[in-house]
Amino acid sequence: MHTRTAGRQAPSRGFTLIEVMITVAIVALLASIALPSYRDYVTRGNVPQATARLSTLSVQMEQYFQDNRSYVGAPGCTADTTTSKHFDFSCTVQTAQAFTLSAVGKGSMAGFSYAITQSNVRSTGAVPTGWALPDPNTCWVTKKGGVC
């Protein structure tokens, strides 16, 4: 024979639907705030691939010039310079005394363009939407707002 205890229910376990929905809403709100910040952080982390490589190539060009009194034929311009995952590099020798090295973003870094000349003049040719160019444009933009 089964007997029941009058008026006593077993305590319920688990979550109600409304509790789960509130938790999902909070997680979605936090993700909507965190993901754009994370993307900006990753983008800022990829910019040094361009600036460091341009600086290295510029030093190689100057070393070549010291030995040969000309930039024509410098290894910084003749070697394969497309070695970065996020940037394509190129070199233009205008005269024996002048060159321009440039880096153009690709993939997730599309929209970025940096350059440096034999006079060590650095410039940012382009930035993606949401970023700004500095005024005057004599540096490499590394953060949103035209910050160099």
List where the protein language model places each region.
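N-terminal secretory signal peptides that target proteins for export/translocation
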Residues: 1-10
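Periplasmic/extracellular, small/polar-rich flexible segments of pilin-like filament-forming proteins
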Residues: 2-3, 62-148
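N-terminal single-pass transmembrane signal-anchor helix
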Residues: 10-38
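Residues at secondary-structure transition points
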Residues: 12, 44-48, 52, 94, ...
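Short, charged low-complexity linear motifs
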Residues: 18-28, 48-52, 56-58, 128
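Membrane-proximal N-terminal amphipathic helix
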Residues: 42-70
